[in-house]
């Protein structure tokens, strides 16, 4: 009996050391796995994103078992040139210049929110891609930290055009309508390559709340925002403002 107790005491330190090694190795393993994940999606088009999975789970949780979403991938050069510049004009005008985070926009949003106005975000297109492709919905500090991590990796390993291509294919433009191709087909019965400048601006205009606003039958807010986006796109210089392939 005494020998058994002694053996247990001797076995405890190695077990603790193994646990400690795993605890120390876990962040490195996660970092390596996430880098491989981002590198993989640099060249492979994802059939579904984490946000789409979340939308399915949300619908099923509400008892809507018949819910289906619409999404079809389109390469960047198969999308009307008016859509990328419209999205950049609406969502992230510093996109070609920043490295994932628009510090000036963050500061403006912080000042605006501190004054007690309607809460304003400052997420760049790169941050939105990180959130939509890799993460879940939520506002926890853990998710925010992971969003920042994936944003850094995306900016490090993907060219700007790939980031924008990914965004145009996973962004939600209507309830269950993801990506430019599905939006063009569902709303106007055409291919994404045939979107007009006005249609492109309308799609960009609904991005703040795509389940609330309608690009096909725009209300007053979407109409005003559409005109503003078109003016901004012209002032930026049109499609030539964006990085070349």
From Swiss-Prot:
A Gene Ontology BP annotation from the UniProt entry: cell wall organization
Annotated pathway: Cell wall biogenesis; peptidoglycan biosynthesis
Record keyword Oxidoreductase present: no
EC number of the protein: 2.4.99.28
Molecular function terms, GO-annotated: pentosyltransferase activity; peptidoglycan glycosyltransferase activity
Gene3D superfamilies to which the protein is assigned, alphabetical: Biosynthetic peptidoglycan transglycosylase-like
Membrane topology, as annotated: Single-pass membrane protein
Compartmental location: Cell inner membrane
Main location: membrane
Catalysis performed (reactions): [GlcNAc-(1->4)-Mur2Ac(oyl-L-Ala-gamma-D-Glu-L-Lys-D-Ala-D-Ala)](n)-di-trans,octa-cis-undecaprenyl diphosphate + beta-D-GlcNAc-(1->4)-Mur2Ac(oyl-L-Ala-gamma-D-Glu-L-Lys-D-Ala-D-Ala)-di-trans,octa-cis-undecaprenyl diphosphate = [GlcNAc-(1->4)-Mur2Ac(oyl-L-Ala-gamma-D-Glu-L-Lys-D-Ala-D-Ala)](n+1)-di-trans,octa-cis-undecaprenyl diphosphate + di-trans,octa-cis-undecaprenyl diphosphate + H(+)
One cellular component (GO) term of this entry: peptidoglycan-based cell wall
Segments traversing the membrane: 19-41
UniProt keywords, alphabetically: Cell inner membrane, Cell membrane, Cell shape, Cell wall biogenesis/degradation, Glycosyltransferase, Membrane, Peptidoglycan synthesis, Transferase, Transmembrane, Transmembrane helix
Protein's job: Peptidoglycan polymerase that catalyzes glycan chain elongation from lipid-linked precursors.
Entry similarity comment: Belongs to the glycosyltransferase 51 family.
Protein name: Biosynthetic peptidoglycan transglycosylase
Organism: Xanthomonas oryzae pv. oryzae (strain KACC10331 / KXO85)
Organism lineage: Bacteria, Pseudomonadati, Pseudomonadota, Gammaproteobacteria, Lysobacterales
């Amino acid at each position: 009996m005494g020998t058994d107790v002694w053996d247990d005491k001797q076995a405890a330190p190695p077990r603790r050391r193994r646990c400690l090694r795993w605890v120390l190795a876990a962040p490195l393993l996660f970092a390596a796995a996430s880098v491989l994940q981002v590198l993989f999606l640099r060249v492979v088009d994802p059939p579904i994103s984490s946000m789409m999975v979340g939308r399915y789970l949300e619908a099923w949780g509400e008892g809507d078992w018949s819910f289906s979403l619409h999404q079809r991938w389109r390469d960047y050069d198969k999308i009307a040139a008016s859509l990328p510049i419209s999205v950049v004009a609406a969502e992230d005008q510093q996109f070609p210049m920043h490295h994932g985070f628009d510090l000036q926009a963050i500061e403006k949003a912080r000042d605006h929110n501190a004054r007690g106005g309607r809460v304003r975000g400052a997420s760049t297109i790169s941050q939105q891609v990180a959130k939509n492709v890799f993460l879940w919905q939520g506002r926890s500090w853990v998710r925010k930290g992971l969003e920042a991590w994936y944003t850094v990796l995306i900016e490090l390993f993907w060219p700007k055009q790939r980031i924008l291509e990914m965004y145009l294919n996973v962004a939600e433009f209507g309830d269950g309508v993801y990506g430019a191709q599905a939006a063009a087909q569902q709303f106007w019965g055409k291919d994404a390559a045939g979107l007009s400048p006005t249609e492109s601006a309308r799609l960009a205009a609904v991005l703040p709340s795509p389940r609330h606003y309608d690009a096909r039958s725009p209300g007053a807010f979407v109409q005003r925002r559409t005109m503003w986006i078109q003016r901004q796109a012209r002032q930026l210089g049109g499609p030539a403002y964006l990085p070349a392939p």
